[in-house]
Amino acid sequence: ELIEVGAGAISMITIAPELPGAIEAIKYLSAAGIKVAIGHTDGNFTDAAAGTNAGASIVTHFMNAMSKEKIEGSISSFVLVDERLSVELILDGHHVPFNTASEIVQAIGDRIVLVTDAMAAAGSVDGNYTIGKLAVTVQNSVARLQSNGALAGSTLTMDKAFVNAINECGVSIEQAVSMCSTNPAKALGVKDRGSIEVGMRADLLSYNSTS
């Protein structure tokens, strides 16, 4: 019903592969041309493999809302070795420490898709906000749930993620552009943007050393 009502508007859905019916759903959605991401999951290595084999091709904000290390192996260990997966990363230094992010980028940089996971306070000021019915406090640009202090989205913007990739993870400008633009377009199957070529959309931003 969602696919029919969406009429092509649904481009990606995140699914926890260990849930009942998840593998069948991944197969169905993939066959319908919808990108499926693995995320918000308590699964393990085997669950991630099953989801990927069923058609999942993206990992939602890697290292966040994911299972910890388990005897059976973690999802993170699968993600790092399976080249079929594009890997989202929130590069704000809070969701993933910059030193850890640097190691991830060095290991799988050509598969990294930078995302913001931004909430209403992005580009705004510290204070109290809501995400749905959840009360959130933003302090020093870090958004946390008032109920338990857990991270609640981010205030990161993509231009800052770009700068962080260069300054904190040591990547080249070309690599940062790929992680912010080319890789996301490739992951979503978008053909008309993501690189500078004849026939592509001319969505260009200018940066310099003071940006």
Roles of regions detected by a PLM:
Residues 2-124:
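Active-site core of metal-dependent hydrolases
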Residues 74-89, 93, 105-207:
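His/Asp/Glu-enriched, well-ordered alpha-helical/loop segment
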